[in-house]
Amino acid sequence: MTQKKIKCALIGPGNIGTDLLMKLQRSPILEPVWMVGIDPESDGLKRAREMGIKTTADGVDGLLPFVKEDGIQIAFDATSAYVHAENSRKLNELGVLMIDLTPAAIGPYCVPSVNLAEKVAEKAMNVNMVTCGGQATIPMVAAVSRVQAVSYGEIVATVSSRSVGPGTRKNIDEFTRTTSGAVEKIGGAQKGKAIIVINPAEPPLIMRDTIHCLTVDTPKPAEIEASVHAMIKEVQKYVPGYKLVNGPVIDGNRVSIYMEVEGLGDYLPKYAGNLDIMTAAAARTAEMFAEEILAGRFELAEAAVAV
């Protein structure tokens, strides 16, 4: 018997949208059927057509008439924080679950290794994947905060300039706000701060992340180390290139962890781990929601949410 698949649409045919499309094509329970853009000449739409995916260059409005006809139940938005609210409203009204890869953060934050099961149980109609820096670093903040209270969490995400598209560059302020908010809300730090560094070095450098946590009490080295290694294993289930470079290094009440993220090389080269962790997390999230839909435990209702 053939496994039934949940049909999906992707909005935004840029770096992230194209990489995500390649991952979804390998999924046992997700089937990408539409790619939505705004430029009929875009390389992303052309590539999608060559892969046998239906395309529209009329934005989300060009997709709406086909949502019911093609049975679309999940949409991924890889456009910009500025347009996400309207995209989400239009698709939620038709009973489509939205996975938000922009920093808009209309729906609850989702970091699969930390809180995916909780978000699936809540049956949210819009979940936000935070940012690439958030996906790479928040698991480490959470790994420390589940051992003991963290008064301050600071993350620095360093990414190759070549891997950062125009959408991300336009959203730098939203990136820092959304990531620092999620360091607090999902990571468990009482106060969070996020910094992104776009490195123009050639050849391009792999994504690197530095995480600093200030603990309220004296750090417990053995427990923190065990928690960090357990969390890394969880992230590696969907991002195999997630690696500890150094740490946890403890200096007074400061716990520092140094990570690197290598991508699978689906669309962009392996140095673009910042894209890979975002698209892999989004695909993992959608698969868990799809399992609930297929099992009949989550029924998508039209106009389930008004944004």
Curated annotation (Swiss-Prot):
InterPro entries assigned: Acetaldehyde_dehydrogenase (IPR003361), Acetylaldehyde_DH_C (IPR015426), NAD(P)-bd_dom_sf (IPR036291), Semialdehyde_DH_NAD-bd (IPR000534)
Keywords of the record: Aromatic hydrocarbons catabolism, NAD, Oxidoreductase
Transmembrane segments: none
Active site: 132 (acyl-thioester intermediate)
Enzymatic reactions: acetaldehyde + NAD(+) + CoA = acetyl-CoA + NADH + H(+)
GO biological process, one term: catabolic process
The keyword NAD belongs to this UniProt entry's keyword annotation: yes
Gene Ontology MF term list: acetaldehyde dehydrogenase (acetylating) activity; NAD binding
One Pfam family per UniProt: AcetDehyd-dimer
Binding site for NAD(+): 163-171, 274
Known EC number: 1.2.1.10
Keyword Oxidoreductase: yes
Family designation: Belongs to the acetaldehyde dehydrogenase family.
Name of this chain's protein: Acetaldehyde dehydrogenase 1
